[in-house]
């Protein structure tokens, strides 16, 4: 067979065909795959994308907590670089004739306030006390505000205040002189107002304790909103509120609340008739009051923590000004009636007057004695006697032996008197504690009543639509030993408070039980 000669072109064609020959991909599965679903080729050309992360985040050095907590030793010289000469004292002596440097002289110059050049800076320099500083929002006030306070001025003022605020009533003589000065100042005529020079007094009246009405305890009743009825006008509403009463009640669940009673039309006519005839009440008349509102109550008195004394003034024409104490503060807030709980919406308070019993008269006399009490002066006399006895004992010790024995007897007598005085003080403290407890109980009794008057009530009275019965015996203490206090009337409010027509009531509620109450 003749040899076959392969030319260069044929050689290139054969190489080209072999290069395009595809090699089947080997499957990773041992067995033959019958159905295969290979991914299609990417339809886009490859391109470069910017790497958004920091390339040093994997190689950046971070100190560990061990390195952070390590404390390095600070090696310094013992004298901290300051050489102190302990031998020659003239080293640190200052020459008074030395001239200061120009830079140091500027530090000793007084600070002179430069005049403001712009109106805006003048406006920002003003301090308005009723506006809130916006220091956290804007720094304009700090940039334009000119401070008139200097450290030197502050130092001087603080030293001066220390002398003025110093307690000058430490010894007995200074206290006596200060008390006598108050009487001298009270005798000086009042020519003008203490802070308003153009205001002059029209009338000057003395102020005294109200000895006449002090026997009756007064309370301040604060409402969260106007308790006046909505359907009444201004003058009629004031007349009704001047005769109103508050009374403690209880709902079906046993929750206590305060009811606000307003007089009816018939009761208003009776009270107006009594006022025209100059009577406090008619003995046989019955006064009806209908419930208007329900309140939750909060009482504070002298026995309560954080109690602040409160007084009110009564102006009596031609007589002067008298002050009285409000020893109880009652704060009333509107009460929400729960669903399904029946309240005393239609309750009627029936008031009938009676004379005061012996316990009430004794309580009035106790309050009068409390106002007229002069125990502090008696204690001062006891202290003066003890001091004189002590001085006599010292003089006796300087004398003969018999005088020393007499002084010893006097000292023993003074010691026994001191022990008696201490016992009396303890008894007074116990009496004060018991009086505070009695006052708290009396305040609760004023709102929720007591069971002392059960025997005075003959029978229950008919109430409103729901058949509730409530009766009351109203006690008056003005004139014939009776008074009444209206729940909404204030010391300055109605004509009844100025004329001192105040009723002290004891009312029945529920099944005809009689409970005493003072409503203010």
Curated annotation (Swiss-Prot):
Biased composition (Low complexity): 506-520
Coiled-coil residue windows: 351-447
UniProt-recorded Gene Ontology molecular function terms: RNA polymerase II complex binding
Compositional bias of kind Acidic residues: 375-386, 417-436, 448-477
Family the UniProt entry places it in: Belongs to the PAF1 family.
Function: Component of the PAF1 complex (PAF1C) which has multiple functions during transcription by RNA polymerase II. PAF1C associates with RNA polymerase II, is involved in transcriptional elongation and in histone modifications including methylation on histone H3 'Lys-4' (H3K4me3).
Name of this protein: RNA polymerase II-associated factor 1 homolog
Species classification: Eukaryota, Metazoa, Chordata, Craniata, Vertebrata
Record gene name: paf1
């Amino acid at each position: 067979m003749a040899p076959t000669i392969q030319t260069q072109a044929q050689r290139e064609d054969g190489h080209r065909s072999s290069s395009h020959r595809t090699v089947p991909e080997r499957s990773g599965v041992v067995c033959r795959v019958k159905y295969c679903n290979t991914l299609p080729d990417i339809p886009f050309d490859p391109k470069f994308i910017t790497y958004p992360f920091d390339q040093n985040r994997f190689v950046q050095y971070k100190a560990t907590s061990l390195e952070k907590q390590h404390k390095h030793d600070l090696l310094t010289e013992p004298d901290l670089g300051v050489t102190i000469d302990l031998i020659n004292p003239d080293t640190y002596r200052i020459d008074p004739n030395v001239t200061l440097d120009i830079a140091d002289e500027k530090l000793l110059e007084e600070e002179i306030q430069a005049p403001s050049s712009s109106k805006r800076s003048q406006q920002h320099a003003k301090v308005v006390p009723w506006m809130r500083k916006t220091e956290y929002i804007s720094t304009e006030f700090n940039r334009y505000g000119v401070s008139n306070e200097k450290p030197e001025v502050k130092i001087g003022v603080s030293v001066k205040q220390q002398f003025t605020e110093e307690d000058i009533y430490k010894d007995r003589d200074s206290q006596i002189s200060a008390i006598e000065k108050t009487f001298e100042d009270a005798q000086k005529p009042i020519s003008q107002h203490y802070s308003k020079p153009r205001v002059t007094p029209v009338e000057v009246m003395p102020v005294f304790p109200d000895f006449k009405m002090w026997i009756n305890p007064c309370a301040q009743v604060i409402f969260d909103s106007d308790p006046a009825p909505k359907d009444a006008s201004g003058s009629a509403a004031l007349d009704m509120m001047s005769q109103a009463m508050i009374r403690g009640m209880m709902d079906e669940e046993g929750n206590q609340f305060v009811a606000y009673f307003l007089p009816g039309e018939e009761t208003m006519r009776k009270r107006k008739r009594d006022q025209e005839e100059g009577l406090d009440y008619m003995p046989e008349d019955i006064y009806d009051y209908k419930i208007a509102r329900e309140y939750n109550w909060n009482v504070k008195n002298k026995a309560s923590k954080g109690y602040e004394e409160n007084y009110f003034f009564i102006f009596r024409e031609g007589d002067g000004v008298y002050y009285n104490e409000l020893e109880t503060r009652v704060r009333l807030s509107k009460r929400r009636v729960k669903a399904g709980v029946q309240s005393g919406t239609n309750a009627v308070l029936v008031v009938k007057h009676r004379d005061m019993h012996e316990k009430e008269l004794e309580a009035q006399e106790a309050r009068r004695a409390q106002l007229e009490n002069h125990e502090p002066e008696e204690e001062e006399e006891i202290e003066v006697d003890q001091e004189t006895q002590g001085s006599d004992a010292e003089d006796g010790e300087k004398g003969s032996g018999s005088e020393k024995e007499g002084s010893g007897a006097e000292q023993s007598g003074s010691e026994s008197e001191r022990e008696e005085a201490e016992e009396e003080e303890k008894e007074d403290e116990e009496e004060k504690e018991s009086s505070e407890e009695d006052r708290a109980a009396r305040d609760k009794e004023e709102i929720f009543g007591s069971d002392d008057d059960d025997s005075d009530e003959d029978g229950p009275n008919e109430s409103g639509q729901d058949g509730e019965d409530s009766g009351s015996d109203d006690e008056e203490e003005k004139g014939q030993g009776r008074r009444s206090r209206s729940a909404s009337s204030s010391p300055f409010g109605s004509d009844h408070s100025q004329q001192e027509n105040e009723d002290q009531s004891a009312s029945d509620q529920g099944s005809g039980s009689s409970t005493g109450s003072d409503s203010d």
